[in-house]
Amino acid sequence: KAAVSSDFCVASRLNIYDGFPYPYGFGVSENGGVEPELSEAVKLVGILHKDLGLPLLDITIGNPYFNPHVNRPADIQPYESPEDPLVGVARMLACTKTIQDAYPDLVLIGSGLSYLRQFAPQLAAGGIENGYFKLAGFGRLSFADPDFPREVLAGRELDPGKCCITCGKCTQLMRFGSMAGCVIRDPVYTRLYQENVNSKEKRV
């Protein structure tokens, strides 16, 4: 904070639950299992918000390299998911609400909403109205349909044909070391994806 002007908003993104057992996983019970146990996460957020003055925090859970079904609920995963993606969405919401309930004045950003596709704005609105978070963050849906906020503000329903299909190819682009975007909806990223796949095949 000392390095920036007073009108600069300092924010952070924080993983509050790893989704794998103690002692390697954060946000789980020391007694075993992988159910969320967020007492340490609540304390950590308190340090960031109350002690250090952090005003804006984006919450995430899971590890995209180990358990992407926790981190990004999707229909298409690199392995058979052990749960319905809606279970993952519900977990994300519950974890976020635990933090928001502990610090009602903290501006919290909810994540993991893109799985709901054209219904994601309704989930976001309900989450805000019911105190789960104060802002809704969208990653995959914003890649697929960059104009979706305009549609929401105009009171129009989202076109399912423009929404994210949760295929994970935007993540693959990042792992290629490339720029990320929607491979399905944007031909620029379709070509970029194919170029990276072809390049990888040649190296193999």
PLM feature spans:
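Flavin-dependent oxidoreductase catalytic cores
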Residues: 1-204
